[in-house]
């Protein structure tokens, strides 16, 4: 099981290392500072997300607090309406972060963004938050995306 987890982590790191840093909007990182946001593959702005594919997400950030755990929340925002966007692993401590989280330490958060075939072909904003154990945002970022066939 550890070998499988290590292999997945290695593949995510390789994919993330080939990604270009994205221009993102910080949407309220209260107890952390985002250093870099990478979504791979995402060669254009806005990101073209193709239905049926999964995208690697790598966020490098510095924690401004201690926390025993962390939870990711992802939403699609369309005309001001926030719709939950399910991700495979909402537990930040299982997404490249060694918990407990320490203050002033740099972390690389790794996850996947699956784009389901049943999603409509639309433009929207993806909002991705990682909350600490007190529900404060370790990071919060937004990027515009286009879901396509």
UniProtKB/Swiss-Prot annotation:
Keywords, in A-Z order: Acetylation, Cholesterol metabolism, Disulfide bond, Endoplasmic reticulum, Glycoprotein, Lipid metabolism, Lipid transport, Lysosome, Secreted, Signal, Steroid metabolism, Sterol metabolism, Transport
One protein family per Pfam: E1_DerP2_DerF2
UniProt-listed SMART domains: ML (SM00737)
Modified how: N-glycosylated.
Glycan-carrying positions: 58, 69
Protein purpose: Intracellular cholesterol transporter which acts in concert with NPC1 and plays an important role in the egress of cholesterol from the lysosomal compartment. Unesterified cholesterol that has been released from LDLs in the lumen of the late endosomes/lysosomes is transferred by NPC2 to the cholesterol-binding pocket in the N-terminal domain of NPC1. May bind and mobilize cholesterol that is associated with membranes. NPC2 binds cholesterol with a 1:1 stoichiometry. Can bind a variety of sterols, including lathosterol, desmosterol and the plant sterols stigmasterol and beta-sitosterol.
Protein name: NPC intracellular cholesterol transporter 2
């Amino acid at each position: 099981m550890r070998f499988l987890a290590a292999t997945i982590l290695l593949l995510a790191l390789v994919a993330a290392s080939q990604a270009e840093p994205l221009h993102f909007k910080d949407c309220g990182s209260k107890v952390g500072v985002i250093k870099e946001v990478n979504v791979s593959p995402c060669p254009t702005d806005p990101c073209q997300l193709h239905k049926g594919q999964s995208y690697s997400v790598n966020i490098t950030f510095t924690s401004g607090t201690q926390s025993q755990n962390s939870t990711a929340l992802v939403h699609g925002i369309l005309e001001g309406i926030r719709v939950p966007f399910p991700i495979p692993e909402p537990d930040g401590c299982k997404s490249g972060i060694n918990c407990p989280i320490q203050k002033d330490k740099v972390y690389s958060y790794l996850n996947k963004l699956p784009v389901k075939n049943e999603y409509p072909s639309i433009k929207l904003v993806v909002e991705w938050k990682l909350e600490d154990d007190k529900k404060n945002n370790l990071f919060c970022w937004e990027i515009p995306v286009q879901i396509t066939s």
